[in-house]
């Protein structure tokens, strides 16, 4: 190849892009060169190099894009972005990531497809220097997915036809090379609320009012790039000729593995920038020489090509304004599988790499380098190979993330920008698929952005804390200092300007609140100190007592030297001093009251001790048997009164000696039931039973024979004996009663035997005559004594004789009484019919099987009225017997009226009840005789009952 091939290639791409705009077909990353000067199989790829399609047909033949779908029609008006970035704050993230087409293997053998847009991989370049990548990105044949639009208010926004998203920021695909250089600068320009521009560094999170030098230099480079021309037409023809001369060697090449080459940056010069162009040409010659040396090394190391490892020399990266640094210290280990992919789809890197195994091509490249031979050539030794192994995909992903972290890839970097920083590292190939790399890169960006935000937040928080501490600790700051005054004092300080106005106001208010609280706390401490000092002075003054007044205390304080020397104490609030004195006096009063209480407690304790001593004295009397539950005060008074403990009890309030004695005896009596159980247990164990004839001495001897009797009270033992003796007597009486009942039952059985004798016993019978008839009867055998049998027989005969006499007399009495009652009934009945009619009506009622409900009610009412009239008669008779005075006549008259009223009420009640109870009224004789028949029926029933009662009385007699 001839010198200037790289420049010619770049010029070919740019000029062809200008003369032939990209078609509306699918953007496959490559563009066919349509010109008479181009050879028939030539092809310009997205990386800016002239390539040949293998197995290329006739130049006029066009191949349809493989595996690509046509782009859909774009909407007329895409949506406007939802919001705007705040002017005071820099953008939180980087520009939108450029869309990178996926890596596709070509369908036709040998067809080469570009992996991604070259426009998104622009390196940072010095002023006046442009690379093949910049030119290739500008001349990309693929149609951009971003379109430019205007919002209703005239602002420009950009719409992505593929993702359907819109943004205010210009995407990388639409940026010029100069704009891309500016976008990579960490310094961005923003405007404050007042419209004043300021500059913010997205990496260091620093903001300043003055324009940074880096940004000024890049803006100067942009003006130079716009003014210069990219390449001339002669360079384009030279590159085409170089491609034609190497066409034969490329067609015969079977290996498509890339050989390390160096992309030669070209200079864009204007008529005013001739010196800059000369410098760029010299730099291009040096880079070409380095590429030739690398090609020579690659041709001699055939074993590397066979084993699948090819050393790659990266493109020089510009890191300063005046020089470029070539980083060729890293090697990339490529597997055999990746080599196979590279044959069909070459990987797009920040440096354009091309490998040729043809010896002739190497010779032509060496000749090209010979034309640009520098003054001094240095032999670079082959870099040491370093291989990495990853057992799992997680380890590979982690290694890829560590690579990003090690290279310090910022969170707002795009994928193209990140590739420039990491592609030369062997760990870049840890993940085989591009999607996996992008996924890991996105995860790294999210994590890094989170860490950067957290770091920025912590720094800002630290700045706020420093500002707050500064205000809180400054001696000129008080709770009454105004913000404007503080701004005049501290406005020029860095700590004042480190935070925003809004946060500064909030912190200032918090500081004022803190200072106010602090001042109050100090005043409180001073008040507490004065309080304690005054309290100590009052405590040490012996002449101040609980009865001292405030005026007296003030005079004492003025005479006190400690109070006179303390100025703060003299400036103490008078109200606080008075309150302190009042509390001191209350404390003295409390001490005086406590002393009185203590003396009272001592006196009460002495009285309690006297009572306890007397209680012990009573215990001693009980142990000696002199005091028990049946003791009395009068019996023991001579013994008790002679003891000193009784004398100490005299005259003291509370319980007296007599009260304690009674309580003691009551306690002994309360123990009776428990001790009685113990006594019963002792008797049960001994098998002793208290009988009627048991003496107390025998009982005591049995009880005292066991150890359990030592705690028993003598009085309770006596009471228990009396109780057991009473129970014994009760048992004896019950036994006698039971024997009497048994004897009575036997007598009854014997009498029953005599009464049921067949034939019956005559009244003149003798016991000896009839005895043999009952000898074998059980009732006869139950009574063992013959005298008892004779006695029972005599009693039986006497009863039999009495019953016989009573039976004869009863018949006579019955006839007389019946006549008497018959006469009385005929006289007392008024307004009724004759006795024959009465008996006839009674027989009629008796024969009737059913009576109506009205007849029952009328008979019941008539019976009730009869009883009332009889009752009134008895009352009137009593009154008549009690008194015969004129007052008795008046009472009789009253009774008569009351009787008439009651009889009238009874009649009306009977009529109303008969009306309500009878379902139908009867006509004729029945309805007229209703009440009369009812009254007659009731009188007949009453007479019948009277007769029955009289007969029962006669039978009883």
From Swiss-Prot:
Compartments reported by the entry: Nucleus speckle; Nucleus matrix
Cross-link (Glycyl lysine isopeptide (Lys-Gly) (interchain with G-Cter in SUMO2)): 191, 241, 375-376
Modification Phosphothreonine, positions: 345, 373, 932
Region (Disordered): 1-36, 243-263, 337-386, 803-957
Biased composition (Polar residues): 337-361
SMART domains on file: FF (SM00441), WW (SM00456)
Ranges of biased composition (kind: Low complexity): 252-262
Residue(s) carrying N6-acetyllysine: 196
Pfam families according to UniProt: FF (PF01846), FF_PRPF40A (PF25432), WW (PF00397)
Molecular function GO terms recorded: RNA binding
Biased composition (Basic and acidic residues): 883-916
Main location: nucleus
Its job: Binds to WASL/N-WASP and suppresses its translocation from the nucleus to the cytoplasm, thereby inhibiting its cytoplasmic function. Plays a role in the regulation of cell morphology and cytoskeletal organization. Required in the control of cell shape and migration. May play a role in cytokinesis. May be involved in pre-mRNA splicing.
Domain-level remarks: The WW domains are essential for localization to nuclear speckles.
Protein name: Pre-mRNA-processing factor 40 homolog A
Organism (species): Homo sapiens
């Amino acid at each position: 190849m001839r010198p200037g091939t790289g420049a010619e290639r770049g010029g070919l791409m740019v000029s062809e892009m200008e003369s032939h705009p990209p078609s509306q077909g699918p953007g496959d990353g490559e563009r066919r060169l349509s010109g008479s000067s181009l050879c028939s199989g030539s092809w310009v790829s997205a990386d800016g190099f002239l390539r040949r399609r293998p197995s290329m047909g006739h130049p006029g033949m066009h191949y349809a894009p493989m595996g690509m779908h046509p782009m859909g029609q774009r909407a007329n008006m895409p949506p406007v972005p939802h919001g705007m970035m705040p002017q005071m704050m820099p953008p939180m993230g980087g520009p939108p990531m450029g869309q990178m087409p996926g890596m596709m293997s070509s369908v036709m053998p040998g067809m080469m497809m570009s992996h991604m847009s070259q426009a998104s991989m622009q390196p940072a370049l010095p002023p006046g220097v442009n690379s093949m990548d910049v030119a290739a990105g500008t001349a990309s044949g693929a149609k951009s997915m971003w379109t430019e639009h205007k919002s209703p208010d005239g602002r420009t926004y950009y719409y992505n036809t593929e993702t359907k998203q819109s943004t205010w920021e210009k995407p990388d695909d639409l940026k010029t090379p100069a704009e891309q250089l500016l976008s990579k600068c960490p310094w961005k320009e923003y405007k404050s609320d007042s419209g004043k521009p300021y500059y913010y560094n997205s990496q260091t999170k620093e903001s300043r009012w003055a324009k940074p030098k880096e940004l000024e230099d890049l803006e100067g480079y942009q003006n130079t790039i716009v003014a210069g021309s990219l390449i001339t037409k002669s360079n384009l023809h030279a590159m085409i000729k170089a491609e034609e001369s190497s066409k034969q060697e490329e067609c015969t090449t079977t290996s498509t593995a890339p050989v390390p080459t160096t992309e030669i940056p070209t200079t864009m010069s204007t008529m005013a920038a001739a010196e800059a162009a000369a410098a760029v040409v010299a730099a291009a010659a040096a880079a070409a020489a380095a590429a030739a040396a690398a090609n020579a090394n690659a041709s001699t190391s055939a074993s590397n090509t066979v084993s699948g490892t090819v050393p790659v020399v990266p493109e020089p990266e510009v890191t300063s304004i005046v020089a470029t640094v070539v980083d060729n210290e890293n090697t990339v280990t490529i597997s055999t599988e990746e080599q196979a992919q590279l044959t069909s789809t070459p990987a797009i890197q920040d440096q354009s790499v091309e490998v040729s195994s043809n010896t002739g091509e190497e010779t032509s490249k060496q000749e090209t380098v010979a034309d640009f031979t520098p003054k001094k050539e240095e032999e670079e030794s082959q870099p040491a190979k370093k291989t990495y192994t990853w057992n799992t995909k997680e380890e590979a992903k982690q290694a890829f993330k560590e690579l990003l972290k090690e290279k310090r890839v910022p969170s707002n970097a795009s994928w193209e920008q990140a590739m420039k920083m990491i592609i030369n590292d062997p760990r870049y190939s840890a993940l085989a698929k591009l999607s996996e790399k992008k996924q890991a890169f996105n995860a790294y960006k999210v994590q890094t952005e989170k860490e950067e935000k957290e770091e920025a937040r912590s720094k800002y928080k630290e700045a706020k804390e420093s500002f707050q501490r500064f205000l809180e600790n400054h001696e000129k700051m008080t709770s009454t200092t105004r913000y404007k005054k503080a701004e005049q004092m501290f406005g020029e300080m860095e700590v004042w300007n480190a935070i925003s106005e809004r946060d500064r106001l909030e912190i200032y208010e918090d500081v004022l609140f803190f200072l106010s609280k602090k001042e109050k706390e100090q005043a409180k401490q001073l008040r507490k100190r004065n309080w304690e000092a005054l309290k100590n002075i009052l405590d040490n003054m012996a002449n101040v007592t609980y009865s001292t007044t405030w005026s007296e205390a003030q005079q004492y304080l003025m005479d006190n030297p400690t109070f006179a020397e303390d100025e703060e104490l003299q400036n103490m609030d008078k109200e606080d001093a008075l309150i302190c004195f009042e509390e001191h006096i209350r404390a003295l009063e409390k001490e005086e009251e406590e002393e009185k209480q203590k003396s009272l407690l001592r006196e009460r304790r002495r009285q309690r001790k006297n009572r306890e001593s007397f209680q012990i004295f009573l215990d001693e009397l009980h142990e000696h048997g002199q005091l028990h539950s049946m003791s009395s005060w009068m019996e023991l008074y001579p013994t008790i009164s002679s003891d000193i403990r009784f004398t100490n009890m005299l005259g003291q309030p509370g319980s007296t000696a007599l009260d304690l004695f009674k309580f003691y005896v009551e306690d002994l009596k309360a123990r009776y039931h428990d001790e009685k159980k113990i006594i019963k247990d002792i008797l049960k164990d001994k098998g002793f039973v208290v009988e009627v004839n048991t003496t107390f001495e025998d009982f005591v001897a049995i009880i005292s024979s066991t150890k359990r009797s030592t705690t028993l009270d003598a009085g309770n033992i006596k009471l228990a004996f009396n109780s057991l003796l009473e129970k014994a007597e009760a048992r004896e009486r019950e036994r006698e009663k039971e024997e009497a009942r048994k004897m009575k039952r036997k007598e009854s059985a014997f009498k029953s035997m005599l009464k049921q004798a067949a034939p019956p016993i005559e009244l003149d019978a003798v016991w000896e005559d009839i005895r043999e008839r009952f000898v074998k009867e059980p009732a006869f055998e139950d009574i063992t004594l013959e005298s008892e049998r004779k006695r029972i027989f005599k009693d039986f005969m006497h009863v039999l004789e009495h019953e016989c006499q009573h039976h004869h007399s009863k018949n006579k009495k019955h006839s007389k009484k019946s006549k008497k009652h018959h006469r009385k009934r005929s006289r007392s009945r008024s307004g009724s019919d004759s006795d024959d009619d009465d008996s006839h009506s009674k027989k009629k009622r008796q024969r009737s099987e059913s009576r109506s409900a009205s007849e029952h009610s009328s008979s019941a009412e008539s019976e009730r009225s009869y009883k009332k009239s009889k009752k009134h008669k008895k009352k009137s008779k009593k009154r008549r017997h009690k008194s015969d005075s004129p007052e008795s006549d008046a009472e009789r008259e009253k009774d008569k009226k009351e009787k008439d009223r009651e009889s009238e009420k009874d009649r009306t009640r009977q009529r109303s009840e008969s009306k309500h109870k009878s379902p139908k009224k009867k006509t004729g004789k029945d309805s007229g005789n209703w009440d009369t028949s009812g009254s007659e029926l009731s009188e007949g029933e009453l007479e019948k009952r009277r007769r029955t009662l009289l007969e029962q009385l006669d039978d009883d007699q």
